[in-house]
From Swiss-Prot:
GO terms for biological process: L-leucine biosynthetic process. One of its GO terms (molecular function) is magnesium ion binding. Residues 39-313 form the Pyruvate carboxyltransferase domain. This is 2-isopropylmalate synthase. It is an enzyme of class 2 (transferase). It catalyses: 3-methyl-2-oxobutanoate + acetyl-CoA + H2O = (2S)-2-isopropylmalate + CoA + H(+). Belongs to the alpha-IPM synthase/homocitrate synthase family. LeuA type 2 subfamily. Pathway: Amino-acid biosynthesis; L-leucine biosynthesis; L-leucine from 3-methyl-2-oxobutanoate: step 1/4. It comes from Azoarcus sp. (strain BH72).
Length: 572
C-alpha cells in the first residue's frame, strides 16, 4: 500500500459544477424521511447474478431459480441478456412458449445500445404478455475517454438513437405491453448535469405518462462513495428528472465498498421507487445489493416487504444449488450462525428473553433482531465449541475420534441435544459421551419407522424402490418411484416432507470404509427442518437410513409440539 494514497486515488465528486461548493446537497431532505412501504423489487439473479458465476446456470438451474423467485413474490424478474448468447435467448423463449410466466409477473431483458442487439432482444420476448426491455450505455467521463474515445454529445446520441429504435421495435409487436428502461451505466461516477441531460433526452423520446411509465435506472455500477453521497445523487436526480410522475426511479447498487444495503436504503429515502439486486448479494465483483437483507431489514421495522422468506433455509439451499456458491455462515438473517450464540452471557440473555416473550407482544428478545420462527428457523445455541471452551468442541471431537465430519447446520442442531445433556449432568462430556448421544439422537431412532431392508429396480426410466419398514411392530412394504433412490424413498414413505439438503462422506479408508449420509428435510406442516443420518457400508443404504432417521425425528418433533400445545391449552 502507498504511504500517500492521495497521489493515486481521489474521492468521486459528481456534484462538481452542479451545486455550490460541489460537495453534495446543502438542502437535502432524505435524512428526515423513513421507509414506510417497500420499493418495487426487481431480481437480476438470472442476468447480472448469472453472468458473474464461475459456471453460469444451465437451463434446469435457471428454471428452478425462476420458479423460486416467483414463489417468493418477485413481480419483476430480469431473466436474460438474450442477444449475448443463444442459451439466454432460448431460455426466454422457453419461459414464454412454455407458459411459465404468471399473469402478475413481468420479465425483463437487457440489451446494449446497438441496433442489431436491440432487434434480437425484442425478438426474444415476442408473444409475451408484458415485458420490460432495458437498454444501457456507459456515460462516465473515464468510459467516454478511455473506452469509447468520444465526447458527451456522442454518448448522448447513442442513448437517444437507442430510445428511438425501442419505439420502432415495440410498434412491430403490438401484442406485448412494453415498459422501456434506460440505465446511464456508471451513474455513480458521472457528472450529475450530464446524467440528467441524457436521461431526460431519453424520456423525451419515450414520452411516458402516469399510466404508461418508463424506468430510469441509476446504477452504482461501481460503488465509489459513502452511501450518503449516493443518496444525495438520487435526491438531485429525483428533483431534476423530466416528467417525474411518469418515471419509475430505479437504483442498482453494487457492493464494492461493502455498503450496498445502506446505499439502497438511503436511496429509497431520497426518492427511489424501485431497487434492483440479487438474493444474498450475488453479482459482478463484490456483488449486487442483497434483496433478502433489504427486505428483512424492512420486516424488522414492522414494514412488510411484499416478499415471503418464511422458509428462508429452503431459499438459501436453492440459491446455493443454482449458483454453486456458498452462503457465508455470518450472512444476515440466513447464515448458519446468525441465530447462534457462542457467548455464555449472550445465551443467558436470549434464553431469558424467550422466557418472557409473549406470542402477540412486540419482539424484545435480546441479541435477536427478528424472531427466527418468522423465517422458518429456530434459535440454535452452540455450547462449548469455540476457543473459549478449553476443548476442541463437539464437531472437532466427533471428527478426530470417530471420523465423522458433520455439515455446519447439523452441528448447530446436534448441539441442542448436547446442551440438554450437559444441563442435566452439570459436567463436561467426553468424546465417547458425545458419540453415544449422537447415536441415540440420529442412528438409534426407530419410531414411527424402523428400517428393515430395501430393493431397487428400474421403473420406466426412473428409479423404483421397495422399502420394508417396521411400524408399531408391524412390517410394511412401501413402494415409490422417483428420479433416484432418495426421491423414490421419499415418495414411498409419503410423509409430505421437502428435501433441503443431502451430503455423503466416507468414514475411514480401504476395505473397512463406511459411508455416512446426511439428509435435511423440511416439515411440510410448517414445523421447521431437521436432519437424519445413516451409516452403512453401502452408500445407497446409508442414504435410505438417513431418510428414515430424518422422518422419525420430524414425527417426534411434531409430537412434542402437539404436547406443548395441549399443555398451553389446558392452562387457559
Amino acid at each position: 500500500m502507498l504511504k500517500n494514497p492521495h497521489t493515486k486515488y481521489r474521492p468521486a465528486n459528481p456534484f462538481a459544477g452542479v451545486v455550490p461548493g460541489g460537495r453534495g446537497l446543502s438542502d437535502r431532505t432524505w435524512p428526515d424521511n423513513t421507509i414506510t412501504r417497500p420499493p418495487v423489487w426487481m431480481s437480476t439473479d438470472l442476468r447480472d447474478g448469472n453472468q458473474a458465476l464461475f459456471e453460469p446456470m444451465n437451463s434446469e438451474r435457471k428454471m428452478r431459480m425462476f420458479k423460486m423467485l416467483v414463489e417468493i413474490g418477485l413481480k419483476e424478474i430480469e431473466v436474460a441478456f438474450p442477444a449475448a448468447s443463444q442459451t439466454d435467448f432460448d431460455f426466454v423463449r422457453e419461459l414464454i412458449e412454455g407458459g411459465h410466466i404468471p399473469d402478475d409477473v413481468t420479465i425483463e431483458v437487457l440489451t446494449q445500445a446497438r441496433p442489431h442487439l436491440i432487434e434480437r432482444t425484442f425478438e426474444s420476448v415476442r408473444g409475451a404478455k408484458r415485458a420490460i426491455v432495458h437498454v444501457y450505455n456507459a456515460v462516465a467521463p473515464n468510459f467516454r475517454r478511455i473506452v469509447f474515445d468520444t465526447d458527451r454529445a456522442g454518448v448522448k446520441q447513442i442513448a437517444v438513437d437507442s430510445a428511438r429504435y425501442f419505439v420502432e421495435m415495440a410498434a412491430r409487436q403490438p401484442g406485448t405491453d412494453f415498459t422501456f428502461q434506460y440505465s446511464p451505466e456508471v451513474f455513480s461516477g458521472t457528472e450529475l448535469d450530464f446524467a440528467v441531460e441524457v436521461a431526460n433526452a431519453v424520456i423525451e423520446v419515450w414520452q411516458p405518462t402516469p399510466q404508461q411509465k418508463c424506468i430510469i435506472n441509476l446504477p452504482a455500477t461501481v460503488e465509489m462513495s459513502t452511501p450518503n453521497v449516493y443518496a444525495d445523487q438520487i435526491e438531485w436526480m429525483h428533483r431534476h428528472l423530466a416528467r417525474r410522475d411518469s418515471v419509475l426511479l430505479s437504483v442498482h447498487p453494487h457492493n464494492d465498498r461493502g455498503t450496498a444495503v445502506a446505499a439502497a436504503e438511503l436511496a429509497v429515502m431520497a426518492g427511489a421507487d424501485r431497487v434492483e439486486g440479487c438474493l444474498f448479494g450475488n453479482g459482478e465483483r463484490t456483488g449486487n445489493v442483497d434483496l433478502v437483507t433489504l427486505a428483512l431489514n424492512l420486516y424488522s421495522q414492522g414494514v412488510h416487504p411484499g416478499l415471503d422468506f418464511s422458509r428462508i433455509n429452503e431459499v438459501a439451499r436453492t440459491v446455493e444449488h443454482c449458483t454453486q456458491l456458498p452462503i457465508h455462515p455470518r450472512h444476515p438473517y440466513v447464515g448458519d450462525l446468525v441465530f447462534t450464540a457462542f457467548s455464555g452471557s449472550h445465551q443467558d440473555a436470549i434464553k431469558k428473553g424467550f422466557a418472557v416473550q409473549q406470542p402477540d407482544a412486540v419482539w424484545e428478545v435480546p441479541y435477536l433482531p427478528v424472531d427466527p420462527a418468522d423465517l422458518g428457523r429456530s434459535y440454535e445455541s452452540i455450547i462449548r465449541v469455540n476457543s473459549q471452551s478449553g476443548k476442541g468442541g463437539i464437531a472437532y471431537l466427533l471428527e478426530a475420534e470417530y471420523g465423522l465430519v458433520m455439515p455446519r447446520r447439523l452441528q448447530v442442531e446436534f448441539s441442542a441435544a448436547i446442551q440438554r445433556i450437559t444441563d442435566e449432568r452439570g459436567t463436561e462430556l467426553s468424546a465417547g459421551d458425545i458419540w453415544r448421544a449422537f447415536e441415540e439422537e440420529y442412528l438409534a431412532v426407530a419410531a414411527p419407522y424402523a428400517y428393515v431392508e430395501h430393493h431397487l429396480a428400474e421403473h420406466g426410466g426412473q428409479q423404483g424402490i421397495s422399502l420394508t419398514v417396521e411400524e408399531a411392530g408391524v412390517r410394511r412394504v412401501l413402494r415409490g418411484v422417483g428420479n433416484g433412490p432418495i426421491d423414490a424413498a421419499l415418495h414411498a414413505l409419503d410423509a409430505g416432507a421437502v428435501l433441503l439438503g443431502y451430503e455423503e462422506r466416507a468414514i475411514g479408508q480401504g476395505g473397512d470404509a463406511r459411508a455416512v449420509a446426511y439428509i435435511e428435510l423440511a416439515d411440510g406442516e410448517g414445523g421447521g427442518s431437521t436432519f437424519g443420518v445413516g451409516i452403512h457400508a453401502n452408500i445407497v443404504t446409508a442414504s435410505v437410513l438417513a431418510i428414515v432417521s430424518a422422518l422419525d425425528r420430524l414425527a417426534q418433533r411434531r409430537e412434542r409440539a402437539d404436547g406443548v400445545g395441549r399443555q398451553v391449552a389446558a392452562t387457559r
